[in-house]
Amino acid sequence: PATTDYLATPTEVPNKGTVILIQKWNGLTRRIKETADAFAAVGYVALAADLYSGRIGLNRDENMALVQETMQAPDQIIRNLNAALATLKARPDVPGQVATTGWCYGGSIALSFALGDGNCDGTAIFYGRLLNDPEVLKQVQHEVYGTFAGLDRGPSVEQVSAFVTGLRTAGIDNDIHIYDNVQHGFWLHVDRDLDRNQAPAEHAWGRLLNYLDRMLSPLKTDSKDA
């Protein structure tokens, strides 16, 4: 990976698989790196991809400028992720199966990446721009995880419902959950309202680990090789 990416590897626990983390709109922040460390602590090789080459937005205008710059070349984003994926798969300590997860801007990119050529074995979305066209969504080749906020307006509950309908129509299994009475960003920023955010954030994390276990289980690799 590029030197600005952040790699966390398991030390005292078995290697369960690999997760690529895709940042929010403000860049590869300390919180995203902490999340990569949390994945490593439970047994995953975790690469937090830096799509801004070391830059971090400090306010809304800077964040928007960085997003617009990268979204002018969406194909380059996918190429960068594929390059990171290839580098990871070449490592001797990385199992063959890889999932992506992203937040907001990163959630949208994770979903787009899942529409590619099947390199990805799992996709976990925390909010983000969604799709609802079954003809597009049927390109996804695995179950999709999603965590959303009931008080969010982007995506709204109605948009999440349309996404779920699109997945079901396309025949894509999904583990989608809308948490009532929390705002956009509740999972990464639990401390903003601990009383309200902590319980749903912990529940979403448990669901995510169960999802990754289903998608990246070594038993799946063994069965393919049998």
Question: Can you annotate each of these PLM segments?
Answer:
Residues 151-155:
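Acidic catalytic loop of the alpha/beta-hydrolase fold
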Residues 102-106, 110:
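Gly/Ala-rich beta-loop-alpha elbow adjacent to hydrolase catalytic centers
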Residues 1-93, 187-190:
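Serine-hydrolase catalytic machinery in alpha/beta-hydrolase-like enzymes
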Residues 140, 146-148:
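Short beta-strand/loop motif that positions the catalytic acidic residue
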Residues 35, 156-167:
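Short alpha-helix in the alpha/beta-hydrolase fold that links the catalytic acid
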Residues 168-226:
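C-terminal catalytic histidine-bearing segment of alpha/beta-hydrolase fold enzymes
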Residues 119-129:
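A conserved short beta-strand
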Residues 92-103:
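Alpha/beta-hydrolase fold nucleophile elbow
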